[in-house]
Amino acid sequence: LGSEGRTTKECDYLNQVIGKERLSAYTANISFTGFTAPKVLWMKNNEPENFAKIHKIMLPKDYLAFRLSGNYSTDVSDASGTLFFDVKNRCWSEEMCEICGVHKEQLAKVYESYETVGTLLPEIAQKLGLPETVKVAAGAGDNAAAAVGTGTVGNGQCNISLGTSGTIFISSDQFAVDKNN
């Protein structure tokens, strides 16, 4: 959950080990308690027996896509909220994985939100009464999808979302980092 608060020590550790500026340079974020990497690091530090059992690390919508298609996948918007993802180079960060004790094989293949990650598994198609040719898309994180839904897609467009969390999206045609982050 984004409201998870147990990971404050892990966030401080990541911000110190990598450095806020360096972390922000490739993730466009600082370490925040709601992100996946601090949660995984917390598990490593506090529940090592469960940490050792991790097969795949995925977010809820990605688990649903896996159950529908049998493929491990995520999209760029959700990957960017894990802190394992190098947003600038659009790949998993070897450095962050190493620091957290995660193997890249434990992370899903990353797609653009609109890309197809697979089609329905035969048993799922049959259960749902749908053809096996139904495509499963990578999808998007909630705020990223909301930004697109509100038309925040042109360079310099802004979307402010206030709810369980507060998010400000400013669309850009290039990678940019908030120097005050």
Regions inferred by a protein language model and the residue ranges of each:
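Glycine-rich phosphate-binding/catalytic subdomain of phosphoryl-transfer
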Residues: 1-181
